[in-house]
Amino acid sequence: MKIVKISPRGYCYGVVDAMVIARNAALDKSLPRPIYILGMIVHNKHVTDAFEEDGIITLDGPSRLEILDKIDSGTVIFTAHGVSPEVKQRAKEKGLTTIDATCPDVTKTHDLIEAKKAEGYHVIYIGKKNHPEPEGAVGIAPDIVHLIERADDLKTLEIPTDKILVTNQTTMSQWDVQHLMEDIQKKFPTAEFHKEICLATQVRQEAVAKQADVADLTIVVGDPKSNNSNRLAQVSQEIAGTKAYRVADVSEIQLEWLQGVENVAVTAGASTPTPITKEVIAFLEQYNPMNPATWERVRKVPLQKILPRVKVKKEQ
């Protein structure tokens, strides 16, 4: 079996930055305890489990405000997905110490929405409902931001002005966004478009589109909650024309997927730890359908290997 290691794949700079911020917080003895992450720091359970070992508690829930209601003291880390001004204000009112790990690409979109609101615009925001990134973006200006996920959402959308900006969640499929923007253009011809697919998402999607077409199967390593991982599987199937499965780690690979397969493409979401992806590749490289000794699929990567290393500051 030949393995096509799609490149680039895996961690993006926004994810690494967020994890380094959280790890440094865990090492900072001056921060009030306990330390919480408001939602998953990035959408990967292996990462959140590793942070639990670092003493950082991940709290998840339907919305950031609802999660915040569970916290009465300590330090709160805002995730890479960003939060609304209301969440920041509520944390301040509760007297919590806050650390912002928002991805710079998300902050850029928030700033754009604020600027356009000041100019009297309404904003159509393309994103996944019940995902934290759109929650934060809509929360910047909920009175003028309209969240849509698919073309059907446009049927009932009415906007009381011709001044309309269209932007999007950074981890969407660039092809889905383009198609939706074309539909929006037809209904709102005066709309201005500002595509905000982050560069890391874009190049990973394009790599799958260009490199997965030579494979019989694509395996995307990523958490089920990771939108960018799920979009990579979608791109493989819809753009490259190659069947794809998303797995959280090697233990989720089903042997029947590999029957009759000669070429397997492997990629990983932007929040997937590199050791987890390497373990998947190592399994596929040694797999022999005729040798049961090669069939074991057990995640063995220790949690200590999941998070990026940070330098420990020496006490003066």
Curated annotation (Swiss-Prot):
The gene is ispH. It catalyses: isopentenyl diphosphate + 2 oxidized [2Fe-2S]-[ferredoxin] + H2O = (2E)-4-hydroxy-3-methylbut-2-enyl diphosphate + 2 reduced [2Fe-2S]-[ferredoxin] + 2 H(+); dimethylallyl diphosphate + 2 oxidized [2Fe-2S]-[ferredoxin] + H2O = (2E)-4-hydroxy-3-methylbut-2-enyl diphosphate + 2 reduced [2Fe-2S]-[ferredoxin] + 2 H(+). Belongs to the IspH family. GO terms for molecular function: 4 iron, 4 sulfur cluster binding; 4-hydroxy-3-methylbut-2-enyl diphosphate reductase activity; metal ion binding. [4Fe-4S] cluster binds at C12, C103, C198. CDD domains: lytB_ispH (cd13944). The active site is at E133 (proton donor). Keywords: 4Fe-4S, Iron, Iron-sulfur, Isoprene biosynthesis, Metal-binding, Oxidoreductase. One of its GO terms (biological process) is terpenoid biosynthetic process. Dimethylallyl diphosphate binds at H43, H81, H131, S226, N228, S271. It comes from Bacillus cereus (strain B4264). It is an enzyme of class 1 (oxidoreductase). This is 4-hydroxy-3-methylbut-2-enyl diphosphate reductase. Catalyzes the conversion of 1-hydroxy-2-methyl-2-(E)-butenyl 4-diphosphate (HMBPP) into a mixture of isopentenyl diphosphate (IPP) and dimethylallyl diphosphate (DMAPP). Acts in the terminal step of the DOXP/MEP pathway for isoprenoid precursor biosynthesis.
